[in-house]
């Protein structure tokens, strides 16, 4: 945690992946995306120097408000050394995550496993999981981290836990409290399993076609 004192009040700001929840990170991403230069603006003939500076200043102001909870009228009075620390914190957050090869995680006293074995059994439940893997990969490509808690609630299970799509909301809500190191590990796991999931979908599709043709 980054510990800073502003106007005699101490603030603890998450600056490591294992310290921030999915919800917190999604909030940061939304602000950062809001002030990105669009492709159309990038390729325009206009000089964007001044505009870039204005957008960056607005972005950092909104990020400071989000990270500290300080009102917009008070944020302008934050000492520059504290602002520099917060900006450094943001820069660290958007650096690339280095995976450790995790295939399970502990959360609120329970152990959940990534879907490692679905290729071995070949059940319809495994087919559902393979579809979720493919769907998750598309979400990640589009930066939709906000969707991942629900998808992880479906795919990441305790030993002998069954997939129950009708009662997944409570688990998904709980998983919004997962920290980003776990979510990143899951995303890297997905990238490795995408090809396998496509093969499973293809296999089940071929089986269905054979059934129809018989």
Feature locations, PLM:
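Charged interaction scaffolds used for protein-protein
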Residues: 1-214
